[in-house]
Amino acid sequence: MDVKQYLTEWSECYRKDFVENIMPFWMEHGLDRKHGGVYTCLDRDGTLMDTTKSVWFQGRFGFIAAYAYNNIEQNPEWLVASKSCIDFIEAHCFDTDGHMFFEVMEDGTPLRKRRYVFSEGFAAIAMSEYSIASGDKTYAQKALDLFNRIMYMLNTPGFLAPKYLDTMKSQGHSITMILVNTAARIRAAIDAPVLTEQIDRSIKALRENFMSCE
């Protein structure tokens, strides 16, 4: 089997699984049609095990549904699901300081807040992808505004609680990597110098700090 045939067969396999298994499962069992957004703790049979909602997953599913609409199949239900997650995020998942919660109750009541900005990153790419899918450019601007907010939080001493004390300086791989993806996905919807600049900075940091010369 040549490489092209190999990739084609696996691509078709993944597409079939996504369209016929993964999305139907989450649309039927995960989508919260009362409060909005999506439940995140489901058993294999779809049984709801916990009604609390991970905020980062609201953005992730909002992105996945919109990306699937843009690249796999223009299923209107997927677009509605994406918008539901974004609406839930905007209505319930931002604290008064602009930093997002990490976990909320099913109705959006705040439950837990952490020092990360991963919730913001997923929310931003959901908004940018939904902008492309729906044609509503206001969501592209919202994504860019949120990205700028992420950068403010990361670069403002004391805004986010540090993981370690200043005893030893360190740099995390996760945020360096995630900023590349976040900026790239937003850039697909709206171009801004700050996005390309961050991608370049992250790639430079990855090469200098996280890659072995081997």
What are these regions (language model features)?
Residues 1-214:
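Glycan-recognition and catalytic cores of secretory/periplasmic carbohydrate-active enzymes
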